[in-house]
Structures are given as C-alpha cells and as structure tokens.
Amino acid sequence: MPWIGKKGSVTFEESTNNANIVINYYRSVGFPDTTIAGIMGNMYAESGINPNREETGGTGYGLVQWTPVSVLQNACSVLGLSPYTSGDVQLQVIPQEVLNHANIAQWYTSEAFISRFYNSGATPDMVGITG
C-alpha cells in the first residue's frame, strides 16, 4: 500500500501502513532491525510516521519533523531528491544526515545523542520488529 500522509494526524492503521513501508525500505538497503526500530521510534514520536505532518504551532515538517522545513528542502536539493513531501524521499535523506554526507546533518555536534545507541547490542527480538 502507498504512503498515507496528512497535514494533521494519521490513524493508528495509517501509521502502521507507513511503518511497514519504513521497515521494508530500510531492510532493502541493509539496515539491521535494531537500527530500524530506533528510527521508527523517533518517527512515531515526531510525526506518528506521517510524511506530511506539519508541526502544530511551529515550522517542523515530515517524518522526523525537520525544523524549519527548509532544512529538509535544502537537503533534498543537495542530494538531488524531490519532492521533499514524499515519504520515500524522506527515507533517503535520513541516512545521509546521520552519516553527514554532503554536510547536511542537522543536530548538535555531540556524540551524546547517537553514539550510545549506534551499537547498542540489542537483538531484533529485543526490539520487537515483526513487519
């Protein structure tokens, strides 16, 4: 099933549909389930796994609430991806940011945010991905 995106909230069923797209995409590019679980946890907290979610009262946008939306737009421009509103495009941007390819990373320069979790040692059964 294709992405389901809305400016507001998506239902649990719609979020589950989108979660399966995320799982299938990141598995297809070789991400371990533990990494996928971490990414999806962030997406769920930020947008409900909704690629078109607009931040209420703010300027965040998309699966991981890029703030302001121009950060996502600029990353897409640098990477030659479009449209920025596409869930598939946003999935491609995230690893590029994490690896800081093309200097598009958007977060504080501290290892405290990702290094603790990058090689956590968690196994797939510990994170419960079944998609």
Whereabouts are the PLM-identified features?
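Short, intrinsically disordered N-terminal pre-domain segments
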Residues: 1-8
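Secreted/periplasmic proteins that engage bacterial cell-wall peptidoglycan
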Residues: 8, 12-77, 92-96
